[in-house]
Swiss-Prot record:
Its EC number is 2.1.3.2. The gene is pyrB. L-aspartate binds at residues 99, 184, 239. This is Aspartate carbamoyltransferase catalytic subunit. HAMAP family: Asp_carb_tr. GO terms for biological process: 'de novo' pyrimidine nucleobase biosynthetic process; 'de novo' UMP biosynthetic process; amino acid metabolic process. Carbamoyl phosphate binds at residues 71-72, 121, 151, 154, 280-281. Catalyzes the condensation of carbamoyl phosphate and aspartate to form carbamoyl aspartate and inorganic phosphate, the committed step in the de novo pyrimidine nucleotide biosynthesis pathway. Heterododecamer (2C3:3R2) of six catalytic PyrB chains organized as two trimers (C3), and six regulatory PyrI chains organized as three dimers (R2). The lineage of its organism: Bacteria, Pseudomonadati, Pseudomonadota, Gammaproteobacteria, Pseudomonadales.
Amino acid sequence: MTPLETKRPLQLNDQGQLQHFLSLDGLRRELLTEILDTADSFLEVGARAVKKVPLLRGKTVCNVFFENSTRTRTTFELAAQRLSADVITLNVSTSSASKGETLLDTLRNLEAMAADMFVVRHGDSGAAHFIAEHVCPQVAIINGGDGRHAHPTQGMLDMLTIRRHKGSFENLSVAIVGDILHSRVARSNMLALKTLGCPDIRVIAPKTLLPIGVEQYGVKVYTDMTEGLKDVDVVIMLRLQRERMTGGLLPSEGEFYRLFGLTTARLAGAKPDAIVMHPGPINRGVEIESAVADGPHSVILNQVTYGIAIRMAVLSMAMSGQTAQRQFDQENAQ
């Protein structure tokens, strides 16, 4: 598995500001920290009686989801609305795409309607990069998840969750458990943790669900839950992505749970104050026990709350960077 290389100008404008948010690969620690700090400031907005700020007033954000995701779509909608943007959500299953219109056609038609930003979720790895580079370079593109490649806002909301509960990344042990092979969340989390200075990143999975070359992300690989969870501070569970699996990668879900399910007994091997995370949707009794998902170590619902703040931060920063780049281009064209 090789992380997709991201050219600096594609995600960042000439001033080094975010103008698209496609992947965490290649982004500096300072920029990730700025996103986290900005999201922290937006958490206060969610606690107000009137949950709005005027940063994107007059702007139009289009959510274009070619894959279903209630949680991600809803939090992007809320984030844009809290920034005072006009929001359009395209239900692809009932749109022209179901009648044969391509991704390219759909986005160019939306661009012609003067949209300022697209949040795109697509089943093909690299779709967001393609759109930003070749289809709509003058529109801010946010990757809402593309194939197995990346889910950068999920990665950042997970980092915000960890930072708010643990303070910093400097002395942490973090275990990512489950279907690493098919998980764009795992890839984004590994990149973010490494960039933010986490010294002990572990992946725990059966060999059939580990990508070739995963060690290049700076992780330690475990195929035994008891060994992998020993004294960790954070446990990030992943669901089995049956829809992306081909062939007999697993004997059964029951066998997976027996060997890799997070139970109360297994969690006892982690640190006493360990937190348990999950990007959702949760498959209870497959990757996690209900007593753990609903227990005192779980911060799963906090992740949803923090997700709105992270997406507010990314939307506002990318829109600002895209606007600054347009002004820069206009000034230099004169």
